[in-house]
A protein has these predicted regions:
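Condensing-enzyme catalytic core mediating Claisen C-C bond formation in acyl metabolism
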Residues: 1-86, 174, 183, 187-258, ...
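Acidic-glycine-rich active-site phosphate/pyrophosphate-binding loop
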Residues: 125-139, 177-188, 232-237, 289-303
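Active-site glycine-rich loop that binds ribose-phosphate moieties when present
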Residues: 141-143, 148, 155-162, 179-205
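Claisen-condensing/thiolase-fold acyl-transfer catalytic domains that form or cleave C-C bonds
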Residues: 103, 121-123, 140-142, 147-168, ...
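Conserved beta-ketoacyl condensing-enzyme motif
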Residues: 43, 47-138, 273-289
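Glycine/charged-rich beta-loop-alpha catalytic/anionic-binding loops adjacent to active sites
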Residues: 78-79, 110-115, 135-149, 189-194, ...
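Short, well-ordered amphipathic alpha-helical segments that serve as non-catalytic structural scaffolds
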Residues: 45, 49, 90-106, 162, ...
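Long, intrinsically disordered low-complexity tandem-repeat segments
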Residues: 365-387
Length: 392
């Protein structure tokens, strides 16, 4: 019996920001060069992002000042320490809210969870959010805890691999995987094209999955990992003095287009990519989705869930692929339908998984028509995620 995602839960911060308003906020910065203004306009307008969520209310131009914006409306750049202090306060409510949502959707009692795997690359703290999940949701103190840190946008896949290994070793295991990313904590005004692109696409959010042995949901059939060696310097995530710094060269979409076919080939066997109707591709950006679709010869419908999540949430790093899977499942996938999930990370790393939709067992004379995995809308993580951050 294979490991199965029984349910997916999601959570977003309360503050929603429109792409046009955020673009104008950056354009209005007095020290932005003429070239930077052109790049800002092109990056924001071509992003295919309509809205994002953030733990920083001051990024909404209609809001008042905060740690990242002064009384005159100018963006300021707090130290990495100040940003991480904000993470310590603002990340735990998102971890807890998405985990609670997943457990409720799965109908899983918190005290039956045997393993917790947490994922994040946008902040560090110990004791970590894994303990917030344990304490606030009533998990057993003896639960096994594992954290995956700083692996970037593809980190949900190593987390699912670990969960599947736990379940394979113990069919009674109940694994809770929780990803939470506060990408906007690392926003800053800059003339650097990589930072401008990051400012235009990244948002905040959290997602969780309950993984067990068998049952209805999304069965995890196989995983594969591939590294594009020539892209080792084209995507990176580093720690600077004024926040974490994204390296995202213009070569990334091209490299992905050239290598994604070989990367997913082990999951397809003799089949063609287009034979899989649904692809849950991490929406790292519009160009990445376009190149993936073109390289694999997929119809536009195959990446519909990915484009919807990019439009409504932007790129939430490791949590995003769970949002895409939940969106795909809400579309009403038939039992037995294959799904391939795919994400890209620093290195340049390509992570993928082949899944199968498993329906509920028939009861009485009726027939099962769906799965238990991720059928609802995003959870508002509540006032805790809007907690004020002291100005540096």
């Amino acid at each position: 019996v294979s490991a199965t995602i029984r349910a997916i839960g999601t959570a977003v911060p309360r503050t929603s920001i429109g792409q046009g308003a955020v673009r104008d906020l950056f354009l209005d910065q007095a020290d932005a060069s003429r070239l930077a203004r052109r790049i800002i306009g092109a990056a924001f307008d071509g992003s295919a992002v309509d809205t994002r969520h953030t733990v920083l209310p001051e990024l909404d131009p209609a809001a008042g000042p905060g740690a990242f914006r002064d009384d005159a409306g100018a963006l300021v750049s707090p130290s990495t320490g100040t940003r991480n202090d904000a993470y310590r306060v603002l990340a735990p409510p998102l971890f807890v809210a998405s985990a609670r949502d997943a457990l409720e959707r799965a109908g899983t009692a918190p005290d039956t969870v045997t393993h917790v795997v947490t994922v994040s690359c946008t902040g560090f703290t110990q004791p970590g959010p894994d303990l917030d999940v344990v304490h606030q949701l009533g998990l057993r103190p003896s639960v096994f805890r594992q954290h995956i840190g700083f692996m970037g946008c593809c980190a949900a896949f190593p987390a699912l691999r670990i969960a599947a290994a736990f379940v394979d070793a113990d069919p009674d295991a109940v694994v809770l995987v929780v990803c939470a990313e506060l990408c906007t904590l690392h926003v800053r005004a800059s003339d650097d094209p990589d930072q401008i692109v990051s400012n235009s696409v990244f948002g905040d959010g959290a997602a969780a999955a309950v993984v067990t042995s068998g049952g209805p949901g999304l069965r995890l059939d196989a995983f594969t990992t591939s590294v594009v060696a020539e892209g080792v310097d084209d995507m990176a995530w580093n720690i600077g003095d004024e926040g974490f710094e994204m390296v995202l060269s213009t070569a990334v979409p091209k490299l992905i287009g050239e290598h994604v076919g070989r990367a997913v080939a082990p999951l397809l066997g003799e089949g063609r990519p287009a034979a899989v109707p649904t692809w849950a591709v991490h929406p790292g950006g519009r160009a990445i989705l376009d190149r993936t679709e073109e390289a694999l010869g997929l119809p536009p419908t195959a990446l519909a869930a990915s484009r919807a999540v990019l439009r409504d949430h932007g790129n939430m790093s490791s949590a995003t692929v769970f949002f895409v899977l939940a969106e795909a499942l809400r579309s009403g996938l038939r039992a037995g339908a294959p799904v391939i999930a795919l994400a890209f990370g620093p290195g340049l790393t390509v992570e993928a998984a082949r899944c199968t939709v498993v329906q509920r067992e028939p009861t009485g004379t009726g027939t099962g028509t769906g799965t238990d995995a991720g059928a609802g809308t995003d959870t508002d993580a509540g006032a805790g995620t809007d907690a004020a951050v002291g100005r540096p």
